[in-house]
């Protein structure tokens, strides 16, 4: 599982001209799922993101989590995080999970964020063409990847 985490002042997602998800201060998550992701990967990632200390404290140090600052999360599915453009000029998406698996995993991940966390969680629409708007705060952007079985 790969998640691109962006600290934002605000973010929103629009589908067919309608805003379907919107947050103020918090985290925009672009969420990618691969074939081998398990429930353990989803839970690990949800816990990591909820506790990730990338918001500044009173001394300007990254010492607070999204929960600590009363922020929110906007989670958007993004299969292109598994794009491989090492060969040729058109990316291959063979490492991305099939849509059925990816949708179920994405939905389970969002449920875990809501269950394990204490912050509002908004979402995009799976497999839709989305217009995602954000105002980066920092900018602070991190790419997280769940540990491989060897790393666990």
Swiss-Prot record:
One Gene Ontology cellular component: cytoplasm
**Mind telling me which InterPro entries this protein's record contains?**
Daa-tRNA_deacyls_DTD, DTD-like_sf
Catalysed reaction(s) here are:
glycyl-tRNA(Ala) + H2O = tRNA(Ala) + glycine + H(+); a D-aminoacyl-tRNA + H2O = a tRNA + a D-alpha-amino acid + H(+)
The EC number(s) this enzyme carries: 3.1.1.96
Q: Where is this motif: Gly-cisPro motif, important for rejection of L-amino acids?
A: 138-139
- Any keyword Translocase? no
Instruction: Give the GO biological process terms.
Output: D-amino acid catabolic process
Q: Which GO terms describe its molecular function?
A: D-tyrosyl-tRNA(Tyr) deacylase activity; Gly-tRNA(Ala) deacylase activity; Ser(Gly)-tRNA(Ala) hydrolase activity; tRNA binding
Listed A to Z, the keywords are:
Cytoplasm, Hydrolase, RNA-binding, tRNA-binding
- Pfam families to which the protein is assigned, alphabetical: Tyr_Deacylase
> Where located?
Cytoplasm
The role this protein plays is: An aminoacyl-tRNA editing enzyme that deacylates mischarged D-aminoacyl-tRNAs. Also deacylates mischarged glycyl-tRNA(Ala), protecting cells against glycine mischarging by AlaRS. Acts via tRNA-based rather than protein-based catalysis; rejects L-amino acids rather than detecting D-amino acids in the active site. By recycling D-aminoacyl-tRNA to D-amino acids and free tRNA molecules, this enzyme counteracts the toxicity associated with the formation of D-aminoacyl-tRNA entities in vivo and helps enforce protein L-homochirality.
Describe the family membership recorded for this protein in Swiss-Prot or TrEMBL.
Belongs to the DTD family.
Q: What is known of its domains?
A: A Gly-cisPro motif from one monomer fits into the active site of the other monomer to allow specific chiral rejection of L-amino acids.
Q: How does it assemble?
A: Homodimer.
**Designated name of the protein:** D-aminoacyl-tRNA deacylase
What gene is it encoded by?
dtd
